Amino acid sequence: MKVTIYTDGAARGNPDGPGGYGTILSYIDSTGVEHIREYSGGYKKTTNNRMELMAAIVGLEALTKPCVVTLYSDSQYVVKAFNEHWLDGWIKKGWKRGKNEPVKNVDLWKRLLAAKNQHDVTFCWVKGHDGHPQNERCDVLATTAADGGNLADDNVVE
C-alpha cells in the first residue's frame, strides 16, 4: 500500500519549553476511498528537533503492515539525516559526529530507524510556513499540542 505522511514539530522556548508534534497519514484503499488520520501529542520540556523526530516516528509506527511511504517534513534535520546519509556516518562512528561529539536524540533516532526499516520510505523536504496545506495543518496540530494542558514528560532532553 502507498501511504503519504506529513509531519511537523514545534517547541515553545526551545530547548527547555513545551513542545508538540503533528502528523497526518493519508492513503487510498483498494476501493479508491481516501483515508486520513491525524496524530498529535505534546511534552512539557523538549526541543523542536525531538518533536520533528516524534512526528515522523508516530506516523511510521501507526502503520500496521509494510508500506511504500513518502514522508514530508519541513525539518532538514530529519530529511538530510536520511537523504545525505548522516545516519550512516553516525552509526559507523558509534553515534558520534564531527569532532567525536555525541549525536543528540539517539533514543529517537534509533526508534525512527526501527520504524522506518519496516517500510520503503522516501523522505522529502517541504518548506515550512509556505502555504503547503498538509504542512500547515501539521503545524496547527503541533502548536496546539504544545500549548495544551495534557503534556507528557520527555525524559531525555539534550
Swiss-Prot record:
It is an enzyme of class 3 (hydrolase). Binds 1 Mg(2+) ion per subunit. May bind a second metal ion at a regulatory site, or after substrate binding. GO terms for biological process: DNA replication, removal of RNA primer. Its cofactor is Mg(2+). Mg(2+) 1 binds at residues 8, 52, 74. GO terms for cellular component: cytoplasm. Residues 1-147 form the RNase H type-1 domain. One of its GO terms (molecular function) is RNA-DNA hybrid ribonuclease activity. It comes from the Bacteria. InterPro entries: RNase_H, RNaseH-like_sf, RNaseH_domain, RNaseH_sf, RNaseHI. Mg(2+) 2 binds at residues 8, 139. Its EC number is 3.1.26.4. Pfam families: RNase_H. Its main location: cytoplasm. Keywords: Cytoplasm, Endonuclease, Hydrolase, Magnesium, Metal-binding, Nuclease. Endonuclease that specifically degrades the RNA of RNA-DNA hybrids. Monomer. Belongs to the RNase H family. This is Ribonuclease H. The gene is rnhA.
